[in-house]
Every structure is written in C-alpha cells, then in structure tokens.
Amino acid sequence: MSEKIQKILSHLGYGSRRNIENMIKFGDISINGKKIVIGQRLNNKNIEVITIKGETVSIKKTDFKTKIIIYNKPEGEICTRNDYKKRPIVFDKLPLLNIHRWISIGRLDINTRGLLLFTNNGNLANELMHPSNKIEREYYIRVFGKINKNTMNILKNGVKIKDGNAAFKSIQTIDHACSKKNKWFKGVLCEGRNREIRSMWQAVQCQVSRLIRIRYGNIFLPKNLKLGDWSELSSESVNNLSNLVSLKDS
C-alpha cells in the first residue's frame, strides 16, 4: 500500500505537510537519488535511500516515537519560527531535536499566556487542531466591561465575529477572583481561530484584559511548570491525547 510522501514525512516529524511540500518544490527531498514531486506516492519496498536537504533519513515507523511537550508560554512571545521584528519566539525555548522539528498544536497570540503543546508527529498535530474533532481548549479569562445574564447567554448561544459565528461550549464566573472593574471567567471552546475569544467578548462590548490557556484536550497546564519552562509528556499521556483523535502512539 502506498501513501503520499508529504503525509509520511509529516507523520514522522520531518515538518508540517506545508513545510514538506515547500521542501519538495525547492528540490530538497529525493528518493534513491531522484528528486520527487508533490503528491508522489511511496511504496516502502521500492525505497533504498531517502534524503532531506542532503541528509539521509529513515521512514521506518519502528525508528520513530511520538513526543509531546508542554510549554508554559509567557506573554510577549510569538508562535512563529521567524520574526522580522526580532521579538521572542517560543521555538527558541524548546529542546533541540535531531532532523525532526517541533510542530505547534495550535497557537496563542502574543498577549496570551499558558499551555502550548508541541509534537514531532505532524499527523497528530493536524488531527488535534482540526475543528471537526472538537478538541476542547479551556481558558481563564479576565474581562473588563458590563456583564449580565444576557451577556453570558449570548456568548453561549453564539456571536458573530469577523470569520463567522463563535460560541463557548461552557463559560462560568470565577467569583472569588472578581473585582469592581474586572471579572474572571473559565471558558471552554472546541476550536482555535485567531483571536477568537477576544473577538467574542468585543462583540458584546467587553474587553479581554488577560487570557490564560489551562487545558488542551485532556492535558492540563501543570501548576508547578513555571512560565517559560517546558516538560515532556509521559508515554501514557501521549497515548491518552492521541486516543482523542483515534491515533495511537507510533
């Protein structure tokens, strides 16, 4: 049985599918000494040598193990690999891999802090991010503005934002953390559109003044993980997260 090259290499952690496709376009990937094309399928029986940017790599699943790390992102860091403004980048804080590279499972904007997951398994990252799988993301949200029962109902039932409708799966007040000017909430979404939570509150004339992600799927931000630090998930936790999208650890 054959599979597309970008799917295989993405699954084995050599980059996202888009990144693999770009490398193919630039002639950076070859099989048995011949450059390949996007969409080309692989049959393992016919492969002798595969190289990426001149370095020989293995595509045997027995040589690959899915890794996932949790990073506690501080405010002020961005979730891209390069930034012309020279702002701090989350990838610079992660442990080095050999030829594989970390793939972010979703993003947080520069002013949001908290849980970020990274994996070396491209297929797993894609599945965990895909809206159809409805993976829960949970946040602490500090809000400034006039909020009443009707406001909460609107946010649960759905509000119109720039790229369509959006609604919290659940949202509740954290009473002990509220002040006269700001109120804290715990909210759950099942998707991760750009600045979605901030846009939802803006649609009801309120402003998010702090946003912290505390959970992705069944993975919670450890209370003892300091801002700017990372920790690797156990094999059991990797399998539990993978099972949410019916993918077992490789």
From Swiss-Prot:
<keyword id="KW-0698">rRNA processing</keyword>
<dbReference type="InterPro" id="IPR018496">
    <property type="entry name" value="PsdUridine_synth_RsuA/RluB_CS"/>
</dbReference>
<dbReference type="Pfam" id="PF00849">
    <property type="entry name" value="PseudoU_synth_2"/>
</dbReference>
<dbReference type="InterPro" id="IPR050343">
    <property type="entry name" value="RsuA_PseudoU_synthase"/>
</dbReference>
<dbReference type="InterPro" id="IPR042092">
    <property type="entry name" value="PsdUridine_s_RsuA/RluB/E/F_cat"/>
</dbReference>
<dbReference type="GO" id="GO:0160139">
    <property type="term" value="F:23S rRNA pseudouridine(2605) synthase activity"/>
</dbReference>
<dbReference type="InterPro" id="IPR006145">
    <property type="entry name" value="PsdUridine_synth_RsuA/RluA"/>
</dbReference>
<dbReference type="InterPro" id="IPR020094">
    <property type="entry name" value="TruA/RsuA/RluB/E/F_N"/>
</dbReference>
<comment type="function">
    <text>Responsible for synthesis of pseudouridine from uracil-2605 in 23S ribosomal RNA.</text>
</comment>
<feature type="active site" description="Nucleophile">
    <location>
        <position position="109"/>
    </location>
</feature>
<protein>
    <recommendedName>
        <fullName>Ribosomal large subunit pseudouridine synthase B</fullName>
        <ecNumber>5.4.99.22</ecNumber>
    </recommendedName>
</protein>
<dbReference type="InterPro" id="IPR036986">
    <property type="entry name" value="S4_RNA-bd_sf"/>
</dbReference>
<keyword id="KW-0413">Isomerase</keyword>
<comment type="similarity">
    <text>Belongs to the pseudouridine synthase RsuA family.</text>
</comment>
<dbReference type="InterPro" id="IPR000748">
    <property type="entry name" value="PsdUridine_synth_RsuA/RluB/E/F"/>
</dbReference>
<dbReference type="InterPro" id="IPR020103">
    <property type="entry name" value="PsdUridine_synth_cat_dom_sf"/>
</dbReference>
<dbReference type="GO" id="GO:0003723">
    <property type="term" value="F:RNA binding"/>
</dbReference>
<dbReference type="GO" id="GO:0001522">
    <property type="term" value="P:pseudouridine synthesis"/>
</dbReference>
<dbReference type="GO" id="GO:0006364">
    <property type="term" value="P:rRNA processing"/>
</dbReference>
<feature type="domain" description="S4 RNA-binding">
    <location>
        <begin position="3"/>
        <end position="73"/>
    </location>
</feature>
<keyword id="KW-0694">RNA-binding</keyword>
